[in-house]
Amino acid sequence: MKISLNGISVQHPSAKPGAVPALREQNLTVRAGEQLAIIGPSGAGKTTLLHLLACALKPSAGSMLLNDQDPWQLSRGALQKLRGALFLAPQVPPLPPRQRVVTAVLAGRLPNESLWASLRSLFYPTDIALAERALAGFDVGDKLFDRVDRLSGGERQRVGLARALVSQASLILVDEPLSALDPTRSQHAIETLTRAAQERGATLVATLHHVEMALAHFPRIVGLRDGQVAFDLPAAEVTPELLQALYAQHLHELTGLANLEADDLPTDPAPVVMHCR
């Protein structure tokens, strides 16, 4: 799916009048089938950007086109059909606690199924082999018939990612998919996700705190800070200097990044601000 953002600003519905928009005057073009990672410090607007692309938030200014269509100019039925081609995997997947994992995974197909098929699948999953393959891709194939409330946080996160594999989405949006995973499982999860997107020709947009993982597995990196695009570059062109500027006052979020040497970090510690009440 193609993406085109032109002068986009987004204000959260709950924001106070006059508040600074969560996203400001963003321009971004993504080709169909492209894979990119969005990085930046906490509060940069990464999750807001994904919700915008998922048509969950309406822009307050500018325009957004998905496959040359403005979602907010479509009829309700056409918008629902467009949303069926999108898949958003939030950082904490909304999995019903008493549901079996197989049912939770196959819910990734619901936007493209009839009402009757959707209701039937809640009680009689119809493609168990598909769910098992998707779970196996994230090393949780043995959890197929477990209840969701018996899974660890990392297992739940991988079940949420397995949903993306069974969906028919042409735009896959993934928010911090590695936050509950150890380094080995993080590596495997990203490889599974990027390979699956490439095989089906889907566009993949992922927000990542793991900068080193983003640079290693995504050909294009978008740096976001204070609701604006700081840089949009091939991964090979993202330098330690750019990362320093992007994460200024948030350098602790770059801890462990191999290509950011100790000499690159500032020698003077940032001032500590204490709030008393």
Curated annotation (Swiss-Prot):
Annotated EC: 7.3.2.2
GO molecular function: ABC-type phosphonate transporter activity; ATP binding; ATP hydrolysis activity
Superkingdom to which the source organism belongs: Bacteria
Primary location: membrane
Catalysed reactions listed for this entry: phosphonate(out) + ATP + H2O = phosphonate(in) + ADP + phosphate + H(+)
UniProt xrefs under PROSITE patterns: ABC_TRANSPORTER_1, ABC_TRANSPORTER_2, PHNC
Matches recorded under Gene3D superfamilies: P-loop containing nucleotide triphosphate hydrolases
InterPro entries reported in the protein's UniProt record: AAA+_ATPase, ABC_transporter-like_ATP-bd, ABC_transporter-like_CS, P-loop_NTPase
Pfam families (UniProt xref): ABC_tran
EC category: translocase
Keywords: ATP-binding, Cell inner membrane, Cell membrane, Membrane, Nucleotide-binding, Phosphonate transport, Translocase, Transport
Domain ABC transporter residues, every copy: 3-251
Protein's cellular compartments: Cell inner membrane
GO CC terms, sorted: plasma membrane
Family (UniProt): Belongs to the ABC transporter superfamily. Phosphonates importer (TC 3.A.1.9.1) family.
Protein role: Part of the ABC transporter complex PhnCDE involved in phosphonates import. Responsible for energy coupling to the transport system.
Name of the protein: Phosphonates import ATP-binding protein PhnC 2
Taxonomic classification: Bacteria, Pseudomonadati, Pseudomonadota, Betaproteobacteria, Burkholderiales
Gene, per the UniProt record: phnC2
